């Protein structure tokens, strides 16, 4: 029977243990003890390590006791002692009985080796557990230390924030106090500056008294006059505003109704052109214009075919008179224009078309009557310096041109009975202006 026949397989374990007998080795043979220890180490190395398993190696049986009995194994079951080897895939039992020639001292030495190994393993396990306990304690201590440090840091941060807020409040309070102190100092300085010396106080009081006496002597008239002038100026400003609004509204109405009138004026002109001597009769029947028409002027007015009065681009800037003539023996012009323009300064400037007179028919510039110089009608076209020039233009524009029919029918009314009376024109009181035509 070979040594391997006694191999005994057991269930795999997580740890390996060494089973030894209860025999205590003696010091009989130190050499045998060392040899047995070397064999045990070699057997341990040769055993293949397994996955959590253990191998049991049987040691040589101890020698019989002195009483002649059979020695018992460690478990009390008898038989061969075994060594469980760490790292094996199974339990290998090597019976010591296979080696017949081994002395009893070898069993004692092997037992001592196994006991020493068991003690070292137990010490190792206990040392490992103690090391783990020490490591855990150190780890817990480090964690506690870190937590305490974090709490201390938070407390420190909170204290710093509180201290910073307190410092800021203290600084702001100091700034406010400094500002109040400076303000008080400035007020005291101003009070000191405002308080004049005693001599100056007397002079100021004397000046105030003199001023009051002067006011009493003047009386309440300036005050009442100022109270009256202020409302008067306010009323005048309001009146100017209303007048400006009225002027704008009047100009808008003039443009509007001027366009509406234009159609009727064109039809009227067409009819008047077919009435011989219409404008000459109207001029001669007018009570103011008739004084300027004498002799040759009346003959020349017989050739007037039409008259137009037109305003310039802006109603208040001026107007234009157009006289249309047919061929006549007195002058060559078929159209004579007289224009009045109001400048920005308010001055009225007149311009006219030069009359081309035929030879020997130049009119007399003035007619002497009752020691007065009276402007001739045709002189009105060429002479712009006489005051009567503007008066003629205003009469034609404001009176004759709006309704020439009433002056034409004056002479006709003398010769025939009129069916209805003429309606007197309504004069609108306004400054020198021009109607649309």
Curated annotation (Swiss-Prot):
InterPro entries: NAP-like_sf (IPR037231), NAP_family (IPR002164)
Cross-referenced Gene3D superfamilies: 1.20.5.1500, Nucleosome assembly protein
Extent of Polar residues compositional bias: 11-26
One Gene Ontology cellular component annotation held by this UniProt entry: nucleus
Gene Ontology BP terms: nucleosome assembly
Pfam families in UniProt: NAP
SUPFAM superfamilies with a match to the protein in the record: NAP-like
Tissue: Expressed in testis, ovary, liver, spleen, brain, kidney, prostate, lung, liver, and heart.
Cellular compartments annotated: Nucleus, Nucleolus
Entry annotated with the keyword Lipoprotein: no
Covalent cross-link Glycyl lysine isopeptide (Lys-Gly) (interchain with G-Cter in SUMO2), where: 156
Keyword entries, A-Z: Isopeptide bond, Nucleus, Ubl conjugation
Chain spans, region Disordered: 1-81
Post-translational modification: Ubiquitinated by the CRL2(APPBP2) complex, which recognizes the Arg-Xaa-Xaa-Gly sequence at the C-terminus, leading to its degradation.
Compositionally skewed regions (Basic and acidic residues) per UniProt: 28-40
Disease per record: Sudden infant death with dysgenesis of the testes syndrome: Autosomal recessive disorder. Affected infants appear normal at birth, develop signs of visceroautonomic dysfunction early in life, and die before 12 months of age of abrupt cardiorespiratory arrest. Features included bradycardia, hypothermia, severe gastroesophageal reflux, laryngospasm, bronchospasm, and abnormal cardiorespiratory patterns during sleep.
Family: Belongs to the nucleosome assembly protein (NAP) family.
Protein name: Testis-specific Y-encoded-like protein 1
Native source species: Homo sapiens
Gene symbol of the encoding locus: TSPYL1
